[in-house]
Amino acid sequence: MKGDNPFAICGLIMAAVLFLAGCGQKNGENYHPDPAGEVRAETGRCWDAYLEYARGDDVLLPLSRSGTNWYEESLNISPVDAFSSMVVMGLTGKADTILEYVADSVDYVKDFDVKVFEVNIRILGGLVSMYQLSGQKRVLEKARDFGDRLLPAFNSPTGIPYFWVNLKTGEVKGSRVNVAEAGTYLLEMGMLSYFTGDPVYYQAAKRSTRAIYERRSEIGLVGEVIDVETGEWINPSSHICAGIDSYYEYLYKGWLLFGDPELKQMWDESIAAVLRYIPEKRDSLTWYGRVDMHTGEHTSSVVTLWDAFMPSLLAVSGHVEEAEELQRTWDWLWNRYGPEPMIYDYRKDSILNPQYDLNPEIIESAWYLWELTGEQRYMDMLQEYWEDLLEYCRTDVAFTALENVITKEKRDYMATYFLAETLKYFYLAFADQQMYTLKTTVFSTEAHPFLKSALDPERVNRHLGLAPWIDRSG
């Protein structure tokens, strides 16, 4: 390079270094050279905080450095919920500690009522996933025992489970449930049937799902609240919001995981009705509000942050264009407030509940779209969401909820799903790994990974009691 100006060369080199260092930055924000490692470290820090301040309790309260329980006694929800994230992130020591504790010290002979839906997705789902990931027979025994304690709830005239069940006596109560509480059992119960060889669990879940589907309206929509004893609709509002959301999720994912053709038929008809009646355009954005299940007429423009899961479901089921359109709406709401508010009215442009509880749904959807399309804008979203959580929700102990997304006032609660879902989805998005992908794995509504690639199709059919199906719903 005889005759070249050495200072000019140094300048070019420095410019190149600065350019490369800036790759991955968004709008000049802090650059994270190893975001997967950062998420992994933060997960370990949160778990250590749980052990220090809330060991043996269900939930960590980061601001008061204490713990709390859902019911009269602990059900050890945080450890069971957190296990699969520890495995996915390679936090082997922490995973082994949880595994040993659950296998040796946890029991569910508890003389109090529990919410069937909530403990199914967290505890039963966590235990069954724990067994698949570890092969620990004592964990499968715990899962079967817990599943048996939930089964009495399904002994209703319709097959739809009661809201409450006593884990010791099997007594039930609560005859009005929403559709999500009625139809979010197929994955957990199905995996339990697969591993135990007893179809009773999957068949109970499927009977409940079928009971909802067969009560759909003439235009193919379901309502929100139903009476488990009479099968009559109490609330005819139809939507994809909290209260119905995971019913639709499990129709598709149940088929995806187990290949049950009845679920695929239910899904195809259901999603066609949803896409026909529920989306609403407002100022270049697409919202999924609430409609009357019988007429399809829009009745409300109230949405919840849980609804942000829908782009992930649309994307994985092949409706990518609709998924991208809806994700743009939720990203707009996040950008407006930082973390998104819990309840928002899009017609009135009004926040009805300003809390943010470390929810994973928008992160889940951004990861699905990143995984399925490879479009850089979804990675940009994920990086922004992570930076916002670090800025607004991180504490010197762990992470905590926000009381108000406008003021960023913190609230003393770290939901168990933050360990199970939110951190896991961030890690999966940022990490270079091929074990837990959308091709190999079906993630439950609590983000517990079920390895589809490890299931034997013949065993699935036999253990779940799958048989040729005839549509008799009319």
Predicted features along the sequence, with ranges:
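Hydrophobic helical h-region of N-terminal Sec-dependent signal peptides
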Residues: 12-18
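Bacterial N-terminal signal peptides that target proteins for export
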Residues: 1-11
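C-terminal motif of bacterial Sec signal peptides marking the signal peptidase cleavage site
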Residues: 20-22
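Glycan-recognition and catalytic cores of secretory/periplasmic carbohydrate-active enzymes
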Residues: 24-474
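Extended rod-forming repeat segments used as scaffolds/tethers
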Residues: 11-12, 252
